[in-house]
A protein has these predicted regions:
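Glycan-recognition and catalytic cores of secretory/periplasmic carbohydrate-active enzymes
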Residues: 37-451
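Short, Lys/Arg-enriched N-terminal segments with co-localized hydrophobic residues
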Residues: 13-19
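Residue-level detector of alpha-helical hydrophobic segments embedded in or interacting with membranes
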Residues: 6, 29, 35-36
Length: 451
């Protein structure tokens, strides 16, 4: 009896010890988990919201409207130096003409714009339709001269076609014009016919004006011959997301899901935790030394565009949240200025940034990605990085004297770069401010923009 009693006591002791060990393990695990739903001070949230409204209403919108409207030739005049002074007529590129149509349309749709901004969008839409659209072969040429009468770069690149679809979709939403929605549908199905890669997924990018294979040199972008770019497919996510919402078309949703797979898998170097840009047609990464670099801006932009794409496709974001965290955390580790706020431009694999200028569009995309990550995860570190990025933008990237944002700010603090040109428009920073205001407003109401 004594032996059995002793045995039971030993077993009870062992069970108690095992239970304590299990509880200890659970405690360690839970302590290691991120703190969720950490709430920033209300006064800080309001400070940022008010500041973003000021940037939009006093810095961004007044710079672009009405001075870029070309009343004589149509479209927008986008050739302004670092002080915002117009430098004279220049070619009109599809990328920035379309981005500016998108911005004025989105400004109107957001409620921050008025009828004058819808009219500005319609002015640009007419130029896309009448001057940049190729009546003979379909699709849009890359650029025309200042008058819109001569195609200075007549070939077709999917990067620019994507922005045309983005503009048409947003303008159709703003104007309720069936013509704009019809042109968007025509463009989508043209890209389906001419550019979709049914063998390897994604889209071929570079074509002659007649949609034959593009010339072997002068690709307008850095697309490898017969290859693909993460950058191009990143910027197909945007229009396919909004066009899926506008059209309700099953094929658009199918192609959107395909792009989600590309942008969450094919372009990711999983062992690194970051994306690279250049690929062969079959998505084999091209990792020559010049290509083995990380663009922090593209990686963090990819995160929030994927979040919105999943929502539009009716897919939950939960399965991809670890990927989002991986990409943003990589950028925060290697490409973030933890002293002054803001993101650097680029760097080698798993190394601190070596291109340390702060480029306007990188700050804009970082702002949105960080706020989305805070909303999605509740992790306060993303809110803190968001505020630090906002403070950098408000204090250093915004040009309060001449309007809009400095294109680039060097580590020394010297600003440089044009305010408007073939690559700079109100799209990145205007969109970022509008998007963050939308998210902050919904957060204040207790609603979520992420599912």
């Amino acid at each position: 009896m004594l032996d059995r009693k002793a045995s039971r006591l030993r077993l009870a002791g062992q069970f108690k010890e095992m239970r304590m060990q299990a509880l200890l393990v659970l405690a360690i695990v839970f302590c290691a988990l991120p703190v969720r739903a950490a709430v920033p001070p209300a006064v800080e949230v309001e400070r940022v919201r008010v500041g973003l409204e000021r940037i939009l209403n006093e810095n961004i919108v007044p710079f672009w409207y009405p001075q870029v409207i070309d009343e004589k030739n149509g479209g927008y005049q986008l050739n302004h130096d670092s002080n915002g002074t117009f430098q004279g007529p220049s070619d009109k590129a599809l990328v920035t003409q379309a981005r500016t149509v998108w911005f004025f349309s989105r400004l109107y749709n957001s409620g921050y714009g008025g009828p004058e901004h819808l009219a500005a969008a319609e002015h640009g839409y007419a130029f896309l339709r009448d001057q940049l659209w190729d009546d003979e072969f379909g699709g849009f040429v890359w650029s025309v001269d200042a008058t819109g009468q001569i195609a200075t770069r007549p070939h077709k690149h999917l990067y620019a076609q994507g922005f045309a679809l983005y503009a048409l979709t947003e303008f159709a939403t703003a104007s309720k014009k069936a013509e704009a929605a019809g042109l968007a549908a025509e463009l989508f199905y043209l890209l389906e016919e001419k550019a979709h890669d049914a063998t390897y997924g994604g889209y071929m990018e570079w074509f002659r004006r007649d949609w034959g294979p593009g010339p072997k040199t002068g690709t307008y972008m850095s697309t490898p011959i017969d290859g693909k770019l993460m950058n191009t497919h990143l910027h197909l996510l945007e229009p396919f997301t909004t066009y899926a919402e506008l059209s309700g078309d099953d094929l658009v949703r199918e192609r959107l899901i395909e792009l989600i797979l590309v942008q969450s898998n094919a372009v990711l170097r999983k062992e690194l935790g970051a994306c690279t840009d250049k690929y062969a047609r079959d998505w084999t990464p091209l990792l020559d030394p010049a290509y083995a670099r990380v663009s922090y801006g593209h990686d963090i932009e990819n995160v929030w565009l994927l979040i919105e794409a999943c929502r539009a496709a009716g897919l939950p974001n939960g399965p991809l949240t670890d990927l989002y965290r991986q990409l943003v955390d990589y950028a925060l580790r290697y490409g973030f200025d933890h002293e002054r706020g803001g993101f650097y431009d680029a760097g080698n694999f798993a190394q601190p940034a070596d291109a340390k200028s702060k480029v306007w569009w990188v700050q804009a995309e970082g702002l949105v990605a960080l706020l989305y990550m805070y909303e999605l995860t509740g992790e306060l570190k993303y809110w803190q990085a968001f505020v630090a990025t906002y403070d950098w933008i408000e204090g250093q990237q915004v040009d309060w004297r001449h309007g809009d944002w400095h294109a680039s700010v060097a580590p020394s603090g010297v600003a440089s770069g044009a305010k408007a040109n073939a690559w700079k428009s109100p799209y990145h920073n205007g969109r970022a401010v509008l998007k963050c205001l939308q998210i902050l407003t919904q957060m204040n109401r207790g609603a979520s923009t992420v599912e």
